[in-house]
Amino acid sequence: MRSWKFSVAIVGLATGLLLSTSNIPPVHADGRRERACSVKTLNGSYGFYRNGTTSTGPLAALGILFFDGNGSVFGSQSISRNGVFTFDVPIPPGPYEVAADCTAKFLTDTGVEVARVLIVDGGNEIYLFSESTGNAVYGVGKKIHTADDDR
């Protein structure tokens, strides 16, 4: 009789422990949960470079992009195309889209996709490649300031 009561107590204790631990949220190594991206993830100024080849030869560029956090980006860049330099070339305002998986697209005002983008490190860095026909151009951008710091 005594061992039966002891067995019931052990089973009850084990059941209670199992039920109480089933509501513990998952633990992540960095202490943060997975985060989704949105247009707000790209917010502020980013220094960038681009490198690769175009239908007219090699391309290298560096510049600055300003993201408003609401889906619009503009900037300026200096470019070397096949060894011919052009400085302070404006990048006109255009829309960008961001998916929850932190992939993004740069678009023209008419909606034509011109670049694919991957947002990394919580929006502190971006990787991109050109989708212009004849181009094999990639780039990297790093956050300089948030939009609040740019004002």
Regions found by a protein language model. Name each.
Residues 1-5:
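Positively charged n-region of N-terminal signal peptides that target proteins for export
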Residues 8, 23-151:
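Mature soluble binding/inhibitory domains
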Residues 9-20:
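Bacterial N-terminal signal peptides
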